[in-house]
């Protein structure tokens, strides 16, 4: 199974900006690795929740579309809300 996510590069950073994204049903994320600069991203929360129910989401190489370019990544970390069924933040590492 392959996973592809459309992403947007985040312009606003910080706690307040992240909270606004979460209220808008989006997930803040970070993409790093391969000797390149880290990039802050935004993903759709509902698509992430649906995909993370599959075990392959955590073990396979995923595709992120960042500024029209496909980037192969693996999930490095997932932060979840302690009570609600929500993903709070994702870390991706370039594959």
Swiss-Prot record:
Coiled coil: none annotated. This is Large ribosomal subunit protein bL25. NCBIfam families: bL25_bact_ctc, PRK05943.1. GO terms for molecular function: 5S rRNA binding; structural constituent of ribosome. It comes from Tolumonas auensis (strain DSM 9187 / NBRC 110442 / TA 4). SUPFAM superfamilies: Ribosomal protein L25-like. InterPro entries: Rbsml_bL25/Gln-tRNA_synth_N, Ribosomal_bL25/Gln-tRNA_synth, Ribosomal_bL25_long, Ribosomal_bL25_short, Ribosomal_L25_dom, Ribosomal_uL5_bac-type. GO terms for biological process: translation.
């Amino acid at each position: 199974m392959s996973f592809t996510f459309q992403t947007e590069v985040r312009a606003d950073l910080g706690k307040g900006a992240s909270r606004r994204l979460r209220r808008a049903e989006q997930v803040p994320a970070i993409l790093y690795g391969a000797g390149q600069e880290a990039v802050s991203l935004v993903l759709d929360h509902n698509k992430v929740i649906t995909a993370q129910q599959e075990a392959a989401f955590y073990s396979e190489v995923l595709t992120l579309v960042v500024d029209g370019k496909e980037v192969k990544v693996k999930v490095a970390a997932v932060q979840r809300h302690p009570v609600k069924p929500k993903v709070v933040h994702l870390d991706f590492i370039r594959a």
